[in-house]
C-alpha cells in the first residue's frame, strides 16, 4: 500500500501527540520571560539562583532524555509518557506552592526530569505508516516553534494578572490535560516499530559521537540555547531599566516573534532550493553576534533593545529550522534517530549552562556583562561554523524489504547502483534498508514504490 493520505487514526495520533508535546513545551517556556523579574520577590532569590532555576530543567532533561527513550522500548510508550507528564505536573505543583527560590529550583528540576520527547517520537513512529511519518514529524516540529512564540506572550500576561504561583498552577493543569489526551485521545499501539530514523539504537552512540560534522552541529545547538537562556536572564531586567514595565514585555515578544516567523521562510527556501545551507547557517551565527553586540550596547535605550531582540529572534527561529535539517543530512544512514537523541541532549545541556552561567554573570556584573559574554561565545561559534563543509543534499528513506528478498550485502550493492542513491544501511533485524537519496533525484523515489 502506497497511500500518502493519512488515515483517521494517523491524524488523531499526529495532532494528539503534537498537542501533548506542545502543552509540555508551553509549560516549560512560559516561565522563561518572567522568572527574572517576578522571581526576585521569592525568599532567598538572587540573580545566580534565578539563573539556576531557569536552566535546571535543562540539566535534568539532558540526564534523562536518552535513558527514558530507551526505556520506552521496554515498558511501553504510553506508560512512560504518562509517567513523565505526572512528574512534570508534580514539579509544577511544588513550584506553585513554594515561596522560596529553592522550591522553584526543585520544581523546575522535576519538570525537566519528566523527559518524554523521545517516547513521543517513538510512539508517533508506531502509529504512522512509513509514507506519512515525515509529515507527522514535521507537524510536531512546526508546533514547537508556534508553542515557543505563544509561551513568550502568555507567560508575562498570566504572571502580571495572576502572579507567579498561578502560572505554575496553570502549567500543572496543562500537564494534567496532556495526561488525559495521552490516555483517551492518542490511539494505542499494538506493536513497537523499530525505526532508526526516529528512535535511538543501543550501541550506535559511539559512531554518532565520532562524526566531526555532527559534533559541530551539536556544539551549535548547545551554543544557541546557552545564548537563549542567558539572554532571557538579562533581557527582562534591561527592558524594565529602559522604562518598559514587566507587564508590557509580551508586546515586544509578540511583535518580534511575528516578524521573525515571517522572515524565516524565504531563508529556508533559499537554503534548500539553491543549496546554500552553509552560507545561510554562517549568516545566522553572524546575525546572533550582531544581536548580542546591539543588546550589549543598548544599555537603557529601549528601541535599541528591541532591535537586538528582533535580530536575535530572526536568527534563533531560523537556526531552530536549519539545525534539525542539517542533522538529518549529515547523520549516517540508519543513525538519524540516535543523532537526534544526542542533538537533543546537547540542546538541554545548553539550557542548563545558559541559565546558570547567565545568572552568575548577571549577579557578578550586570545585564550588559551577560550580553557581552554572549557576543564572545557567538564569535567562537562563528569561527567553528566557518569551518563547516556544505552538507550533502540528501533525503532519508526507510524501505521495508519484502519477505522473499534477502536482507544482505548483495541487496546493498544493488541499491547503491540505483541512480541517486548515496548511502545504504541494511538492518537485518528489521528486514529493512535505510537509504540516503539525492533530494532532487526523482527517479530514486521509485525505491519506495
Regions found by a protein language model. Name each.
Residues 107-144:
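Cytoplasmic helix-loop-helix junction between adjacent transmembrane helices
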Residues 86-99, 286-300:
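C-terminal ends and interior cores of transmembrane alpha-helices
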Residues 63-99:
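Conserved MFS/SLC helix-loop-helix module at the cytosolic interface between two early adjacent transmembrane helices
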Residues 65-76, 263-276, 362:
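Helix-to-loop junctions at the C-terminal end of transmembrane segments
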Residues 173-192, 381-389:
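C-terminal membrane-cytosol helix-exit motif in multi-pass small-molecule transporters
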Residues 2-10, 187-218:
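Juxtamembrane intracellular "pre-TM" segments in multi-pass secondary transporters
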Residues 140-183:
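Helix-loop-helix hairpin linking two adjacent transmembrane segments in secondary transporters
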Amino acid at each position: 500500500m502506497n497511500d500518502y493520505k493519512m488515515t483517521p487514526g494517523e491524524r488523531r495520533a499526529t495532532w494528539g501527540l503534537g498537542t501533548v508535546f506542545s502543552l509540555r513545551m508551553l509549560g516549560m517556556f512560559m516561565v522563561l520571560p518572567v522568572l527574572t523579574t517576578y522571581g526576585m520577590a521569592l525568599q532567598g532569590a538572587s540573580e545566580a539562583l534565578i539563573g539556576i532555576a531557569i536552566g535546571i530543567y535543562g540539566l535534568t532533561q539532558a540526564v534523562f532524555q536518552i535513558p527514558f527513550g530507551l526505556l520506552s522500548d521496554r515498558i511501553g510508550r504510553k506508560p512512560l509518557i504518562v509517567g513523565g507528564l505526572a512528574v512534570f505536573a508534580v514539579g509544577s505543583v511544588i513550584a506553585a506552592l513554594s515561596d522560596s527560590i529553592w522550591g522553584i529550583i526543585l520544581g523546575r528540576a522535576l519538570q525537566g526530569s519528566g523527559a518524554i520527547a523521545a517516547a513521543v517520537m517513538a510512539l508517533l513512529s508506531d502509529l504512522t505508516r512509513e509514507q506519512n511519518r515525515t509529515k507527522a514529524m514535521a507537524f510536531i516540529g512546526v508546533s514547537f516553534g508556534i508553542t515557543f512564540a505563544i509561551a513568550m506572550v502568555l507567560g508575562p500576561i498570566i504572571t502580571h494578572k495572576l502572579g507567579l504561583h498561578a502560572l505554575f498552577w496553570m502549567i500543572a493543569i496543562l500537564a494534567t490535560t496532556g495526561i488525559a489526551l495521552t490516555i483517551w485521545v492518542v490511539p494505542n499501539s499494538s506493536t513497537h516499530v523499530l525505526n532508526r530514523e526516529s528512535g535511538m539504537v543501543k550501541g550506535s552512540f559511539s559512531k554518532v559521537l565520532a562524526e566531526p560534522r555532527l559534533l559541530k552541529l551539536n556544539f551549535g545547538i548547545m551554543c544557541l540555547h546557552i545564548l537563549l537562556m542567558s539572554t532571557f536572564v538579562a533581557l527582562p531586567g534591561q527592558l524594565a531599566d529602559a522604562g518598559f514595565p514587566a507587564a508590557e514585555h509580551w508586546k515586544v515578544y509578540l511583535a518580534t516573534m511575528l516578524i521573525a516567523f515571517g522572515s524565516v521562510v524565504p531563508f529556508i527556501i533559499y537554503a534548500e532550493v539553491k543549496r546554500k545551507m552553509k552560507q545561510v547557517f554562517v549568516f545566522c551565527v553572524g546575525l546572533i553576534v550582531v544581536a548580542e553586540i546591539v543588546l550589549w550596547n543598548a544599555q537603557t535605550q529601549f528601541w535599541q533593545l528591541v532591535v537586538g531582540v528582533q535580530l536575535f529572534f530572526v536568527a534563533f527561529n531560523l537556526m531552530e529550522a536549519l539545525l534539525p535539517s542539517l542533522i538529518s543530512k549529515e547523520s549516517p544512514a540508519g543513525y538519524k534517530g540516535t543523532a537526534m537523541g544526542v542533538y537533543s541532549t546537547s540542546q538541554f545541556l545548553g539550557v542548563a549552562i545558559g541559565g546558570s552561567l547567565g545568572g552568575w554573570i548577571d549577579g557578578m556584573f550586570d545585564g550588559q556583562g551577560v550580553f557581552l559574554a554572549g557576543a564572545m561565545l557567538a564569535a567562537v561559534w562563528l569561527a567553528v561554523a566557518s569551518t563547516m563543509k556544505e552538507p550533502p543534499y540528501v533525503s532519508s528513506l526507510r524501505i521495508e524489504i519484502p519477505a522473499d528478498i534477502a536482507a544482505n550485502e548483495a541487496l546493498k550493492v544493488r541499491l547503491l547502483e540505483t541512480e541517486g542513491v548515496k548511502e545504504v544501511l541494511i538492518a537485518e533485524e528489521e528486514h529493512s534498508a535505510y537509504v540516503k537519496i539525492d533530494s532532487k533525484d526523482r527517479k530514486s523515489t521509485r525505491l519506495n514504490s
